[in-house]
Design a protein with these regions (language model features):
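Cytosolic regulatory regions of ion transport systems
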Residues: 1-8, 12-136
Length: 136
């Protein structure tokens, strides 16, 4: 064990950075995430992803919440409806690695994800709260 009570981390021989930090940086810089819905869930998710250095864009109809998110998190925001293809294109959904639909409407979240996948998003995740939508 190294002085200070921590084990030494492997270091990348080219940069001198800890190897884990370099992997996290490369992973984070490569992923673009679009979040539709800037309520408690959407904002909390954006906050965590920004901390981890992901490229985050948030979409919502409410300009006041978008301004709050843009100011607090220094991210791009798009005012519009998450089921609108034009809004999703403006937010970058066709090139997104992940779109998360986290509005307060299960139906909007599902349509948003279907639209995003149709536009080319690699993955789409809908927040679904109604147990009637559970397959099985």
């Amino acid at each position: 064990m190294a002085a200070g009570g921590t084990d030494p981390q492997p270091v990348d021989h080219l940069t001198g950075w800890p190897a884990e930090d370099k992997r996290n940086e490369e992973r984070s810089l490569a992923l673009k995430i679009v979040i539709v819905g800037n309520g408690k869930v959407g904002f909390s998710l954006a906050e965590q992803l920004v901390r981890e250095k992901y490229d985050v864009v948030i979409v919502d109809l409410r300009e006041d919440t978008l301004r709050r998110a843009a100011d607090a998190l220094d991210i791009m925001s798009v005012k519009g409806n998450g089921i609108s293809a034009a809004t999703l294109i403006e937010a970058g959904a066709p090139d997104a690695d992940l779109l998360v639909a986290a509005t307060n409407s299960d139906e909007i979240n599902m349509v948003c994800c279907l639209t995003a996948k149709h536009l080319g998003a690699k993955y789409a995740l809908a927040r679904i709260r109604n147990p009637e939508y559970n397959a099985g």
